[in-house]
Amino acid sequence: MHDMKKLDNLKHLDKGAPEAMKAFWAFDKAAFAEGALTGQVKQLIAIGVALTTQCPYCIEIHTKAARDAGATDAMLAEATLVAAAIRAGGAVTHGAHCF
C-alpha cells in the first residue's frame, strides 16, 4: 500500500524549496506543540483527519505518536468512528444539493 521509506524523498522538497519547507516544518512543529490541547489530543485529531483524507503515511505516523502519548485502543477506536461519522455526515448533508 505504501512504503514509509518514500518519505525520505521529502529531502528533495527541502532542497528544491528550502525556505518554504523550513516554514512548513516550523509550522508543523508549532501546530503539534502542547498548548490548550494536549499532544495526545492533537494526535487523535490528526488521526481523524488522516483517516478522512485517507493518507496512509499520516495514519501510521500519527497513530504511533498518539500511542507514544498514551492513547489507548479505545481512544483510537473513538477517533476512527468520529472520522467515519464526519465523512458520512458530509455525504448526507451534501445530499441536500440534490433537491
Regions found by a protein language model. Give the residues of each.
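Acidic, glycine/proline-rich low-complexity segments that act as flexible tails and inter-domain linkers
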Residues: 1-43, 67, 93-99
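Short cysteine clusters
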Residues: 55-58
